[in-house]
Amino acid sequence: VPFGHASPPTFLNSRGHKTYHFERNMMDRLAPVDRLVIEQRKEWGEILTGFETKNKYEVSDQEGNSLYYAAEVGGSLLLRLFLKALRPFTVMVVDSDSQTIIEIRRRFRFYFHEADILDADGQLLGKITKRFTLVRRVYSITDSSGEEIFQLFGPLLKPWTFQIMQDEMEQGRITKKWSGLAKEAFSDADNFGVTFPLDWEPSTKAIFLGAVFLIDFVHFENKGG
């Protein structure tokens, strides 16, 4: 069970697809993947009371097979209630044995939101930083040395889409996905899809997996989708 005890080698996730028990470098499981689905798992207590509890997510591949799990960890109830989407956070992405894959850390800021994406050893993989613009939503993606390697652009007329750009060429997208009529009626659960080139390094794909969580907090949390 994620965030607890170890799992058997394979089991079925909530959609009846296989979840794999991985060995080797867990980030390597991103190598054969060109699309990720990140689904927020709302707790019934939150649905019934309207209070934010700690966010939990399931990360699956393009075939619906579970790869990882993610959860917001730490943080006080007061921060959640008063700062809401502005609060600092740490999100841990783990495998089915609770082994860390990446960690996303966001410090408190009113503006120019940013988050660090760290590997399992705590080494910086990259950083996502919101840039100042009057209209468009723009983020800079930098590598561990601070060099900008990508940008994220949110088109004005497509509020649920962020284009992954490199040298003015679109390389992929982060898209908020509609989570279904029944779920939307009772919660503001956010689901995302991420697409990128198949031949990217797993560490680069992991940076954009981490970027999803900052985008979710800044643009969609407490906004009802």
Residue ranges of predicted features:
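Low-complexity or membrane-interfacial segments used for flexible interactions
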Residues: P2-T90, S96-Q99, R106-E114, A120-L125, ...
